[in-house]
Amino acid sequence: MEKLLLLDSNSLLHRAYYALPGLTDSKGNPTGAIFGFVSMLARLIKEEKPTHIAAAFDLKAPTFRHNMYSGYKATRKPMPEELVKQVPVLKKLIGDLGIKIVELEGYEADDIIGTLAKRFSCPTDIVTGDRDSLQLIDDTTNVLFTKRGITEVVRYDKERLFEDGFETPSAIIDYKALRGDASDNIPGIPGIGEKTAMELLKTYGTMENVLANADEIKGKLGEKIRDGKDMARLSYTLATINTAVPINIGMSDITFSYPLSKSAKNALIALEFTSLTNRFAFTDEEVKSEENDTSQVKIKYTTVEIDNIDDLKKLFDDNKGKPFALNAGADVDVAFSADRLYVIKQNYDLFGGMTMDDVLKEIAPHLTSECVVSDLKKLLHLFKDAGVETSATPKDIGLLAYLVFGGRSFKDIVTLAAAANVSADSVTAFFAICDYLEKELESKDLSSLYHDIELPLERVLFDMECAGVKVDVGVLEELRKKYEDEIETLTAKIYSYAGETFNINSPKQLTVILFDKLGLKPSKKNKTGLSVNVDVLEKLYEEHPIIPLILRYRQISKLLSTYVLGLEKAVSSDGRVHTEYKQTLTNTGRLSSTEPNLQNIPTRTVEGKEIRRAFVAEKGKVLISADYSQIELRLMAHMSGDENLIRAYKESRDIHASTAAEIYGVDIADVTDEMRRNAKAVNFGIIYGISDFGLAQNLSIRVADAKKYIERYFRTYPKVKEFMDGQVEFAKEHGFVRTLFNRIRLMPELSSSNYAVREFGKRAAMNFPLQGTAADIIKIAMLKTAKNLEGTSAKLLLQVHDELIVEADENEKDKVEKILRESMETAVKLSVPLTVGVASGKSWYEA
């Protein structure tokens, strides 16, 4: 029987790109979107068994919709450069796979798909991540809607569409005509949202019926509909897919031959997608038997469900001493081998069964260091919630992958498995994934980083998350009242200068007030019009008294909403805030704090520092803070080997004053405060590869002067320049850079065709060895601190950049301060001293 598969290629490519970011071939060319697209295609071919396939693409040229409405898709961001580069490569590969590409200037892929779906009467599946195509559903056409990137597909037919509240497929168009579509910038009727649009359609059936009855609809809603009739009809036309596109395509043109040809296989191998060849069938001459396939580990398994405690006990008794793979979610998945998956079902029945606590209590005693999990810290929290403890430290493939793939995170098993050359979708793949990653870990010289730093750190972070930090809600309430009062005062003053009330938080309305009404001269535009960002407003600071008020309003509003109100919501029943530390999120190796983020509390403003007053010690305890001094500059001295920089630190000189003396050509005694501030900007700017233009902007000086400062800096510290240039050259040659502890960061940016991306890559290559090493050192310090605090009352609570915060009994303050200082200063031996500042108090503000 004939079966047609229509691919909305641009939509699928976008989803694949964001599902597999950062994937590159051995030459640094981006391939993640192509890999994801072809992975999905392999699954579709296997499951849907199409006899005909067409891949529809959008073209750059404007369509009839753009000619009809200039704002159509005007708010869309341009396609990322790394994705643009993959489009022609994908098109060639699609052709090599024997699939017809269909595109036509003036029309979108949706229109081509709609035309083909209506032209042929055979069963048809449209594969897309765009809900517009739901209007094409009929008796022979379904839509396979992609969700969660590329890992989940939902089949939509008339019945499923009805379940979502749409009586007919055409109701999708009516809905968009009323509500609009932000992604395509289809306006709809202003002021009508999702709920109102659905209620109107439920009452009146169609958009035209809504408009016809507008006079009967009372209040503001009726007024909106009457005023928006023309916009609704325009939106209806924009949202309607054209099913009569003039394309000369017949069924014979889109016939799909399967198994694939030899050239298709060679095309996949040429793109280094050897693992994907195992997911397609090829013609007899090159069919590869699974027994002889060494390119990819393909996992096949049977599933066994366990729903009672006796069977669970028997499972572990029968496999006593064997390592197992474990993944805990809604259910708990266990595998002792790759060919059998045990799904342990929770049962909340009042009359018996197993709860999650029962399951975890049974599993915990069997956990060993040879077991494999995907997120150890998360598992430790589940065990804690179940009231059980384990001293075992199993292998963590999430952490392994993060190190092996240079700081990349993985959202699910499928994408992680694909990266590890394994074809699988369950915990049964964990052993094969782990084997692959451990070999890569060894070959990339990352074993010590994993075993000695990252893996043991998971328990330290778990303990910190459990401990949390006490928050004085009274301080937050005081600050909330203070900030709300100031916002009210600022608002009144801003309205007075503006001569009218308006939404101060609306860039559009603010633009009208500043540039149209008050006549200020704009200095910058963005894609949606004139910019009113902080940079623009600061340049206008002296032009009108309203500007300082707006800047202050934004500052206080941010403090109130993000920090004061955000922290109030985050306080747990124990009166403490328990942040979560993400260990595999950043590509520098630095930890990331979330829910709430305690690492971005501002420290440079008086108001920002005030918020730290809310973080307090328990009664009878103190908070002790220890902070590395200029750690990245000290690392620059050590890693560059520059004698002048090393000497300055060994002699405990004021490094910023020393640099100022050199770049200004004055005696150090004659360095002014302004000179020192400028030198400080140079010192820290150099670490991040700052340009003369960037330094000139930071210091508000001429570019020529900034260039002189940088040249004098490199004359003073010549090996710094050699080191930075050397890192860029190493990255170009090897595709990555390393820290002192061998952490790697992949550098695909350096092979980008985009100049700005390449320049960013150069700066990242210069900075990562320093910032990444600083991250490694603070982690080592955390491990030493946690170990050395054993036997005391103290607990490590927070890590914020280069700072550690500990809570201790007041009578142990001096002892703990000494432990903290020594643990941090001896974390690693450098050619310059690591200096740590230690302070204590009843609050983080005082410490």
Task: Please annotate each region the language model reported.
Residues C466, H578-T579, T584-T586, A661-T792, ...:
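Conserved catalytic core of nucleic-acid polymerases
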Residues A335-A338, A401-A424, A429-F430, Q583-D667:
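Function-dense linear segments that define catalytic or interfacial modules
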Residues D485-A492, S496-I547, R715-R763, N767, ...:
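C-terminal polymerase-core module
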Residues H52-A54, E105-E108, G129, T302-F316, ...:
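Conserved DEDDh/DEDDy metal-dependent 3′-5′ exonuclease domain
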Residues M1-A54, D58, R65:
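Non-catalytic, usually N-terminal nucleic-acid engagement modules in DNA/RNA processing proteins
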Residues G228-G352, S423, A429-T603, V622, ...:
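Conserved "right-hand" nucleotidyltransferase catalytic core of DNA-directed polymerases
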Residues Y17-L20, G71-K85, D139-E167, G222-E223, ...:
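Short alpha-helix plus adjacent loop in nuclease-associated cores
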Residues P21-T24, A74-P246:
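Extended two-metal-dependent nuclease catalytic cores across DNA- and RNA-processing enzymes
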